[in-house]
């Protein structure tokens, strides 16, 4: 597998980079190609133009992407640009499955996902891009297949947004652009090897607290039968819903699953005092505050 990344400022940069890829020996020798796109420009027309250009110039390519606060190129954050990362596989194969939850009923999407999983051979990894907060069913959707038991690494991201921005502007995209949806990329190959490592730069602190009530998988209502918003007031002195993310992001909750620590960063406190997350929280789990280890 070969990887090439470019930070582009406009569509001219994109076309130039894509043509360079097309004329390369790596592209000509590739069996399959994936282009991941990360963009700060929450403009459907711009995104559609970029994705159409990719598919027109690179006829082998599958596309997946999302809107985000900032992209990363060569491991460094890059502000004010769109990032294109091209993966070129000589022997492995790529499949992309996407659902728009405005158009497709959740149960129908779940069945299609499970059927796809059952029929894929030599599946080695899954990448997921989704619109957090837009579709409350994302976590439930992914749990329709036991990925841990199948020992298939899963990784990805949720579309990001600036603090105070309107969540409706979050977008993910594959063949189409979705305001409420999910784009799943399957990596397959008999000789493909994917090394997955879990790292977390947070250190747990304080006592464990039990999740006692959850709404829609990702809205925490009570902890130890105390309103979740009051927990932040009592321990961190955060009383206002305004700038809630900025005031709490340095002290995320941590929980253990399958022997590994996971972090849950609250992004919103609603008018009822409930705390919203972009990933699932389960009733009965033990939460503990944490702080940055470095």
Language model feature labels by segment:
Residues 1-55, 61, 66-68, 75-125, ...:
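Small-residue-enriched flexible segments
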């Amino acid at each position: 597998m070969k990887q090439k990344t470019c930070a582009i400022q406009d569509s001219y940069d994109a076309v130039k980079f894509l043509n360079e890829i097309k004329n390369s020996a790596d592209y000509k020798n590739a069996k399959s190609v994936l282009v991941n796109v990360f963009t700060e420009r929450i403009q459907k027309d711009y995104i559609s133009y970029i994705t159409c250009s990719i598919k027109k110039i690179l006829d082998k390519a599958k596309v997946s992407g999302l809107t985000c606060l900032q992209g990363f190129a060569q491991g460094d954050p890059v502000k004010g640009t769109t990032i294109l990362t091209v993966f070129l596989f000589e022997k492995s194969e790529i499949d992309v499955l996407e659902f728009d939850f405005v158009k497709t009923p959740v149960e129908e999407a779940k069945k299609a996902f499970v059927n796809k999983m059952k029929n894929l051979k030599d599946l080695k990894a899954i990448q997921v891009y989704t619109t957090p907060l837009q579709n409350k069913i994302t976590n439930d959707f992914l749990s329709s297949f036991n990925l841990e038991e199948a020992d298939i690494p899963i990784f990805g991201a949720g579309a990001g947004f600036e603090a105070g921005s309107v969540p409706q502007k979050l977008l993910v995209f594959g063949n189409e652009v979705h305001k409420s949806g999910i784009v799943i990329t399957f990596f397959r190959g008999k000789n493909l090897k994917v090394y997955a490592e879990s790292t977390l730069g947070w250190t747990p602190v304080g006592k464990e607290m039990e999740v006692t009530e959850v709404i829609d998988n990702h809205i925490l209502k009570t902890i130890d039968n105390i309103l979740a918003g009051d927990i932040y007031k009592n321990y961190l002195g955060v009383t206002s819903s305004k700038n809630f993310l900025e005031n709490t992001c340095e002290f995320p909750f941590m929980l253990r699953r399958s022997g590994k620590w996971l972090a849950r960063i609250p992004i919103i406190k609603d008018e009822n005092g409930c705390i919203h997350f972009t990933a699932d929280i389960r009733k009965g789990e033990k939460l503990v505050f944490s702080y940055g280890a470095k």
